[in-house]
A protein has these predicted regions:
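GHKL-type ATPase core
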Residues: 1, 58-81, 92-215, 221
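Bergerat-fold GHKL ATPase/HATPase_c domain
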Residues: 1-35, 84-86
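Flexible hinge/switch segments at interdomain interfaces of large molecular machines
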Residues: 4-12, 55-56, 149-159, 251-266
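Bergerat-fold GHKL/Histidine-kinase-like ATPase
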Residues: 12-13, 25-31, 48, 218, ...
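Short, conserved non-catalytic motifs in the polymerase core
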Residues: 19-21, 99-101, 106, 262-272
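Conserved ATP-binding N-box helix of the HATPase_c
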Residues: 25-48, 110-117
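A conserved short beta-strand within the histidine kinase catalytic ATPase domain
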Residues: 48-54
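GHKL/Histidine-kinase-like ATPase module
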Residues: 175, 183-184, 190, 194-311
Length: 311
């Protein structure tokens, strides 16, 4: 028999198709999905602060100071835009070219997937002078959007508890989240991200917490990666340019070790397998340095042909 799975039901039936797997990796991916929404707001210039909290019960709360998810009635769906974003796959600002110039998020499945895979999710939106709130369970709304307070702030807070009947692991690892938030701070200079773990109380009575912020972005990232190595050049080479409306940024340095470490990203997503962006960079670097060496007659005495790997 042929089954047609509607909307979020499909996510609950085949979660791995949407978030990769249902173990530790997928569990942490839920947090990245929500944080990526806030980062998209930051990249559009509307958000400067993102706060991630691991609560005592291993639920997660992510707060930002962006514009807040829209709450007005969605024309086509006839429901609040907030409910549409949280219950319809591929809904949101990143599929319309005008809203975001850059957007991350996995395959654009977005925060509706997080909702589908959580026993409880609560969205609070600060927008138009009011606090709007809606709660969900396993992707289904428990009630319509309610106005619960007045406010002069803007932003979104999403709290969610991953579904233990879907995930084989439900305990969040602080270090995994810290690594990703640190990386996001380096990739998005000027934004502040904070991680707090309410499961760990320090001696002074405060919770374990860390703030990630970088003013110099990739340049600082390279220094951080290279911090334990012996440098060959005094500072990081940093290039920022734009080609056909697409911003490109490169930071590199040389040290005395023989192993290279290369990290490439597109829209904040680590492209582990490389791609044309990395291949193009390697070609450009090789060609430029080779030409410089030839023009400066540095290669006349060399007995061997130098290759890209030599750079």
């Amino acid at each position: 028999s042929i089954q047609v799975l509607e909307g979020l039901e499909a996510v609950r039936k085949r979660p791995s198709m949407y978030i990769g797997d249902t173990s530790e990796k997928g569990l942490h991916h839920l947090v990245y999905e929500v944080v990526d929404n806030s980062i998209d707001e930051a990249l559009a210039g509307y958000c400067t602060y993102i706060d991630v909290v691991i609560n005592e019960d291993n639920s997660i709360t992510v707060t930002d100071d962006g514009r807040g998810i829209p709450v007005d009635i969605h024309e086509k769906e006839g429901k609040s835009a907030l409910e549409v974003v949280l219950t319809v796959l591929h809904a949101g600002g990143k599929f319309d070219k005008g809203t975001y110039k850059v957007s991350g998020g996995l395959h654009g499945v977005g925060v509706s997937c997080v909702n589908a895979l959580s026993t409880y999710l609560k969205a609070e939106v600060r927008r138009n002078g009011k606090v709007h709130m809606q709660e969900f369970s396993c992707g289904k709304p428990l009630h319509d959007v309610q106005v619960i307070d007045n406010t002069d702030k803007t932003g979104t807070t999403i709290s969610f508890k991953p579904d233990g009947s879907i995930f084989t692991v439900t305990e969040y690892k602080y270090d995994i989240l810290a690594t990703r938030l640190r990386e996001l701070a380096f990739l998005n200079a000027g934004i502040t991200l904070r991680l707090t773990d309410k499961r760990v109380l320090k001696e002074d009575g405060s919770f374990k917490s860390e703030v990630f912020h970088s003013d110099e972005g990739l340049k600082e990232f390279v220094r951080y990666i290279d911090r334990s190595k012996e440098k060959l050049i005094p500072d990081v080479i940093h290039i920022v340019t734009e080609k056909q409306g697409i911003p490109v940024e490169v930071a590199l340095t040389y040290n005395t070790s023989y192993n290279e470490s290369v990290f490439s990203y597109v829209n904040d997503i680590n492209t582990i397998e490389g791609g044309t962006h990395l291949a193009g960079f390697r070609r450009g670097l090789t060609r430029t340095l080779k030409k410089y060496a030839e023009d400066s007659k540095l290669l006349e005495k060399a007995k061997v042909e130098i290759q890209g790997d030599d750079f």
